[in-house]
Amino acid sequence: MIEIRNLHKSYSTGQGTVEVLKGIDLTIEQGAITAVVGPSGAGKTTLSHCISLLEKPTSGQVLVDGRNLSALSGQALRSERRAIGTIFQHSALLRRMTVAENVALPLRNLGVVHREMEDRVAELLDRVGLLHKASAYPGQLSGGQKQRVGIARALALRPRILLSDESTSGLDPESTQQILDLLDDVRTEMGLSVILITHEMDVVRHVADQVAVLANGRVSEYGPIGALVADPGSGAGRQLLPVRALPLPAGFDYALSVSYRHGPVDPEWLTRLSTGLGVRVALLGGSVEAHGETVLGRAEIGVAGRPEAEVRGYLEQLGLVADPGAAVSAAATASPLTPTAPPSDGAGFEANEKIGVSA
């Protein structure tokens, strides 16, 4: 387990001291994938450097299994660095070395005997699906292949922690998914704690267990993916599962933003809401997605016929939570919608496909 306690990091410049990290507190469970996201300048890279011990924090602690790594120096620090494998945004492979030689580099630096090193390199390249590229040079590889070599090298010393610093940035969708699947697999097989530094919310949603949002050097939100998406007030939740809602049509009283809470939700909840309360419901947009064993869902609906408080209370009984929606009246800008029955085949709904209105 990794514990980051009241971490501060400042730099001296010609114009004075700049504080980049301002009291970071995080707990990263063993075997979990934790994403750290935020805009440029939020402090993500600085935090990753402090975790990987490339830089010492100005104050605060980085504890791994209870040991304060930020207080170490010399041989003790070098020894603990081996417990942290890092995958960089650009693979940082040495272009004059073959793939096998690049993976072997940390083993050679540690003084591992040749035969053992060869076996370990072959094992790692086989694990990332590149054993057939052992004699190739980095210039002969695709971007995704280079990152897989980077993962193999990061795993060479059998780390307990894997730090991925924007490792999928700039990759095509297929290569990105291959890297994410590989990270998920090695996490499970090796029991690693994975820290995923990224700005891509699709990446976070597909692979992370929990997410920390950095803003201006502080943690603004932190929690499991499902909990954030289920919280209508969470900005991170809205970014993780965005909904592009259509305007509220004429004849509807108000809009609601609806989120799935933890636990099962009837896929026919729109029908149940309409028939149970006798209200008209317009589906303005939404998205439903599986995340492990959890179903994430968010929707924007328009309602007519009952007070908002009554509708919100009924939605809670269905395992949903609602807040005032973002849709605005479109009476002056859109034609009235033709009422149709909501989906009743259990298929749920897809964002931006159609508007379902029930009476």
Where are these regions (language model features)?
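ABC ATPase NBD coupling module
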Residues: 15-18, 69-85, 109-114, 228-232
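Helix-to-loop junction immediately C-terminal to a conserved catalytic motif
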Residues: 52
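Short coil-to-helix segment of the ABC ATPase nucleotide-binding domain corresponding to the Q-loop/switch region
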Residues: 97-105
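Conserved ABC ATPase signature
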Residues: 137-141, 145
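A short, proline-enriched helix->beta-strand linker immediately N-terminal to the Walker B motif
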Residues: 156-160
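ABC ATPase "signature
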Residues: 222-223, 231
